[in-house]
């Protein structure tokens, strides 16, 4: 009966029997080993210092059927370095991942921090200008800028098409007033001045207007509204009055009867009696 603790290794079927290799077999394995190592770029020679290497190789050949490679201790360090280099080359994803890590980090940081928004200039919408009513007046005058009771500031002038006379632009000097006016002479009749007003004044006049501009307005309403003294009468009225007085003085006046002394009572001349004459009557002073 076979003892399970002590198996019989003398049987031919045992996989653990010791094989004795001939010199021809050892040369065969040496050639295969050198060929395999030369494929990897290793020029290694079989060392006779390790007699058990052939035995180990023979056992692996019998059990697995794969040709073993014998590596001596002298080349163990160089083989380890070569294997490490080979493993690094066989795994490029690790190297690429390590090199791509900074790029991924920069991309992540870029995603976290939003790009600075460029300031958009707010375009102010131009308010539509309300068209003011216009009034035009034609006046015969030698002066272009007629007096109308307001103060104006000239801010522009330009030539008029088909007219030798330029057009002047004025603006009211009051900061709250938006009234404008244009002054130009007529190309047909140079003696006529065309004044065009745009808008209405929101303030009182500066002073009493000069010239004959009052003919277009009621003088009584103007003076009552602005509390100004009434306008003087027509100067021709004084001239007529003076002529009438002159004629009256030159005309012969009728002779009046001279009054007589009998008709007129005697007027007592006051005497210098002082205060006594005022207090004491004359009958008491002259008995």
Swiss-Prot record:
Record field: compositional bias (Low complexity): 86-99
Assigned GO CC terms: nucleus
Alphabetic keyword roster: DNA-binding, Nucleus, Transcription, Transcription regulation
DNA-binding region ranges: 141-206
Region (Disordered): 86-137, 248-287
InterPro entries for this protein: WRKY_dom, WRKY_dom_sf, WRKY_plant
Record's compositionally biased regions (Basic residues): 122-132
Location of the protein in the cell: Nucleus
Residue ranges with Polar residues bias: 262-271
Example GO biological process: response to osmotic stress
Position of the signal peptide: none
One GO MF term: DNA-binding transcription factor activity
Protein purpose: Transcription factor. Interacts specifically with the W box (5'-(T)TGAC[CT]-3'), a frequently occurring elicitor-responsive cis-acting element.
Record family assignment: Belongs to the WRKY group II-c family.
PANTHER family, sorted: WRKY TRANSCRIPTION FACTOR 57-RELATED, WRKY TRANSCRIPTION FACTOR PROTEIN 1-RELATED
Protein name: Probable WRKY transcription factor 57
Organism placement in taxonomy: Eukaryota, Viridiplantae, Streptophyta, Embryophyta, Tracheophyta
Gene encoding the protein: WRKY57
């Amino acid at each position: 009966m076979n003892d399970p603790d002590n198996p019989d290794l003398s049987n031919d079927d045992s996989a653990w029997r010791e094989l004795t290799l001939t010199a021809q077999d050892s040369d065969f394995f040496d050639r295969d080993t050198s060929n395999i190592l030369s494929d990897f770029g290793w020029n290694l020679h079989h060392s006779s210092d390790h007699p058990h290497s052939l035995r180990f190789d023979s056992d692996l050949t019998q059990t697995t059927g794969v040709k073993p490679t014998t590596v001596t201790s002298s080349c163990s360090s160089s083989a380890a370095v070569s294997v490490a280099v080979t493993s690094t080359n066989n795994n490029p994803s690790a190297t690429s991942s390590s090199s791509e890590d900074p790029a991924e980090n920069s991309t992540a940081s870029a995603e976290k921090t939003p790009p600075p928004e460029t300031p958009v200039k707010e375009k102010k919408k131009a308010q539509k200008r309300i068209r003011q009513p216009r009034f035009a007046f034609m006046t015969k005058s030698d002066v272009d800028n007629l007096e109308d009771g307001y103060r104006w500031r000239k801010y522009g002038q330009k030539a008029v098409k088909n007219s030798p006379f330029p057009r002047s632009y004025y603006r009211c000097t009051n900061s709250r007033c938006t009234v404008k006016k244009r002054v130009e002479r007529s190309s047909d009749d140079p003696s006529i001045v065309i004044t065009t007003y745009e808008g209405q004044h929101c303030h009182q006049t500066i002073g009493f207007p000069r010239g004959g501009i009052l003919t277009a307005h009621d003088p009584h309403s103007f003076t009552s509204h602005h509390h100004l003294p009434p306008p003087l009468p027509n100067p021709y009225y004084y001239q007529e009055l003076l002529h009438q007085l002159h004629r009256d003085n030159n005309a012969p006046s009728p002779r009046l009867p001279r009054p007589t002394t009998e008709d007129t009572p005697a007027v007592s001349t006051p005497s210098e009696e002082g205060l006594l004459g005022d207090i004491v009557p004359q009958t008491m002073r002259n008995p």
